[in-house]
């Protein structure tokens, strides 16, 4: 199968779905059976999946150690990985390994424990990233969260499942020109 044929067919392939498997370590994926959907994932002659989507949501992953190696074992063309769903895990940072997938266009990280807004900056190197979710992380509580993300990731067209509007772009551009930094929202203290 030519590279062009692969790109055309794999986009339509169902995801390799390891969601709701209580996976604790990325290495466990090698021995874990993926969930089956209405359409089965096709495999190459070597047994690797012919898909560009990997769903790891609703597990208990707290790091992505050995992610590249495991993805290479699972996918025939890991370099073409376009969609990664890591939502509802226990991640506290955006692992730099995610920035090695230059064809990544959809990345779901909502419902984790990411607490430093600066983590978002790592994703700026992904030229095709268009859809990103981060809601449900502690960073969402920072004032200016949306503007900060859109300022640093100007190619995003969908953020937290909402389309990016012209007004969003305009506000993000103002933030960028003015060098505005987001502020942590402080919990109100009861005054006696």
Curated annotation (Swiss-Prot):
LRRCT domain: residues covered: 137-175
Places the protein is found: Cytoplasm
InterPro entries (alphabetical): Leu-rich_rpt, LRR_dom_sf
One Pfam family named in its UniProt record: LRR_9
GO cellular component: cytoplasm
Tissue: Widely expressed in adult and embryonic tissues. Expressed in the developing choroid plexus from 12.5 dpc and in the epithelium of the developing airway tract from 14.5 dpc. Also expressed in the postnatal inner ear.
Swiss-Prot/TrEMBL keywords: Cytoplasm, Leucine-rich repeat, Repeat
Main location: cytoplasm
LRR repeat coordinates: 49-71, 80-101, 103-124
Origin superkingdom: Eukaryota
Record Gene3D superfamilies: Ribonuclease Inhibitor
Protein name: Leucine-rich repeat-containing protein 51
Lineage of origin: Eukaryota, Metazoa, Chordata, Craniata, Vertebrata
